[in-house]
From Swiss-Prot:
Residues 1-35, 225-251, 469-492 are annotated as: Disordered. InterPro entries: AB_hydrolase_1, AB_hydrolase_fold, DUF2417, Meta-cleavage_hydrolase. One of its GO terms (cellular component) is fungal-type vacuole. The keyword Protein transport does not apply. Residues 112-122, 169-174, 293-644 are vacuolar. It comes from Saccharomyces cerevisiae (strain ATCC 204508 / S288c). This is Uncharacterized vacuolar membrane protein YNL115C. The lineage of its organism: Eukaryota, Fungi, Dikarya, Ascomycota, Saccharomycotina.
Amino acid sequence: MKANGLDNDPARTGMERTDIDSEHPEAQPLLNNNHRTLGAGSANGPAVNEGRDIESDGFIKDSLFQIRKGYRIFIHNSKWILNILILINTIWLVTTLISDFFFNINILFGFSNRYASFNDLTLIFISIIANSFNLWFNKLGLYSALDYSLNVTLCVLTLFNLALTYLIKYTRQRIGFVGTFTYLWTSFSFFIGAILDWYLLFYNNSINEPLEERRIDDANISTFNENHTNSTENRDRSQYGSGSPTPTHRSQLVQNKHTLTEWVSIGFRNTIKFLILIFFALFTLNTLLTTLDTYRLTHKLPITVQSPSYEAFHYVDAAKTYQLHITCYGDVFDQENNTDLSENKKQPIILFEHGGYDTGYLSATWIEELYHLDKIQRYCLYDRPGYGLSDSPPAPISIAMVAESLRYALIKDAKIKGPFTTVGYDLGGLFTRVFTAKNVDIVDSMMLVESWHEELLLKNYIQRLLPPGRGDGDDGDDGNGNDGDGRNHDKTWLPSEIERHNEFRLWWKGIWSSLGWRLQTSWLLAHHGSKERIYGRDMKYQGRFLRSKFLESVTSSILSYRDVTNNAESLQNVKTSIVSSKEMVKKSALWGDWQRDLTKISHKTQEWKIVEGGHEIYKYGLGKQQTQEVLLRLIGELGKLTED
């Protein structure tokens, strides 16, 4: 009885089992039974299936291996593609730079862009930036949803700009294959960036998906065990009293976190892309404004010969390289009675050549006034290449090239035979001299109004044009127009046409002209119209105009200077009149000397008139009237001005 009682004693039985277990440890199970056990088994709850875990882990590892293998292939291939695109971009940038600004090599391939400006160069450069960023930031840890959105937006904006360009006939006919392809290529660069972002998102989700599924399964098992543990603990507490619970195992969530370096890289990339977005927003507004202005001025063109005025575009050669915008008033096609000695003899056609920073819209108003007063019968204006509505010329350009282009456009294409009285204002005086010299057979007389001297085409002309000071040094000024030797360097009296900017400054302005913010303020703040932006005061902010000024500046002291000097002898028998500004002559003795030299280019100089007012004589009432009288005397029609 006693033995049986001892055998049935739970405490003794536990002690004996403990002794046996300590003597034979290999008999112990690998994991003791515990309600928190996640291993081999638990007497108090369900156990995790080890076979399932091993199979699941193997599947995950195999999936991740395949995904990462595909990712490495994707990175390798994308680097090759992007490097090739950047190489093509760089070659294209250099080619465009040379072709648009120094020598037209596109003509070798039969391509032309009659709407060339700084836009193409800017778009190609942005394309290089986009492809470079695609290459540098094409990593799994650098994916950003914002970058994807920016790439898509920039791609659409670029295509929208191209659509605006193709919206109207004028720009659609002139942009050409090269200009169109530039827009498409830039859009393609942003499209590539969006595709790469999409692939990064795909691989990011593919890598995280199996881990996320495993996490969900582990979380479900953990939740089940936790619920079972809570019920067991509650039962233990009720049986053995309160105790401290053991922390439950939790699987860590697979999160898409970035390191500090990655955040800096993402922030830098997105900042640059955001700046590009701002640029494209301004670029789009500029394109929209230019499209509206151009449409307003060209949608009714050409105006046919049946109208009182004639306005059309004419090619400059048989190859149809580009077109000049020509406007005429009066019957310029009537060739009858040109040799008649009667009173009904037709006057010569006044052919006006505008200045360096204007068109006939501004500087020919004094001739327009004579026409409306019926003092002259007919006159023609044209915009030089890159000015107003005339096409952008191929590089290089010189005065003689423009003169030859004008002759073909007038005589061959427009069938305006002349004869002409050529009138040149400011820089246009040099173009008038060369055109007259090359066409003495169709030119009756020539008039130069505040004309440039050929010496102004040379690079160091400003130092010689400035009034002399008390010193002979030229060490730079102090910002107030004086240098250390007392020499006056105040250039404020110089007209903007004469104070020519150097090539770098023209280049810099041209690059920023793509934004068009000065053109935007012209209508937002100054309330200027379309003609002012295309022909008038705001034309100097147009990218096509700045490109033409750059081309003129590059060749001025080489080709253009030689054109003027080589054709000087042909002018000796041309009837000529000279008009000079009194203010300009008084401010610079050298300017007066140069004007005097102009009176000697012909043996048949009729008069040299110094009129009241400044360089822009058409703005001064008395000076304008005096200039009109000189023109009428030159063509033998002065009596009409004094008639009641």
